């Protein structure tokens, strides 16, 4: 039973890391898209 808390924390860390990575990629893509639009104007 001592394994479950560490596993829970591990999964929470993985999830938060994935969310942070996803947000970072979304921001980078948005910035590049905005840059393209501004250059085409």
From Swiss-Prot:
InterPro entries xref list: PSII_PsbX (IPR009518), PSII_PsbX_type_1_subfam (IPR023431)
Lumenal topological domain residue ranges: 2-6
Record-annotated membrane-spanning stretches: 7-29
The keyword Chloroplast appears for this protein: no
Topology Cytoplasmic: residue spans: 30-41
Annotated membrane topology: Single-pass membrane protein
Domain of life the protein comes from: Bacteria
BP terms from Gene Ontology: photosynthesis
Cofactor note: PSII binds multiple chlorophylls, carotenoids and specific lipids.
Gene3D superfamilies (alphabetical): Single helix bin (1.20.5.510)
One Gene Ontology cellular component: plasma membrane-derived thylakoid membrane
Keywords in alphabetical order: Membrane, Photosynthesis, Photosystem II, Thylakoid, Transmembrane, Transmembrane helix
Transmembrane helix keyword on record: yes
Subcellular location: Cellular thylakoid membrane
Job of this protein: Involved in the binding and/or turnover of quinones at the Q(B) site of photosystem II (PSII). PSII is a light-driven water plastoquinone oxidoreductase, using light energy to abstract electrons from H(2)O, generating a proton gradient subsequently used for ATP formation.
Protein name stated in the entry: Photosystem II reaction center protein X
Protein source organism: Thermosynechococcus vestitus (strain NIES-2133 / IAM M-273 / BP-1)
Gene (UniProt): psbX
């Amino acid at each position: 039973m001592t394994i479950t808390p560490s596993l829970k924390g591990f999964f929470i860390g993985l999830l938060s890391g994935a969310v942070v990575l996803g947000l970072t990629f979304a921001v980078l893509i948005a910035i590049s898209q905005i840059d393209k639009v501004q250059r085409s104007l």
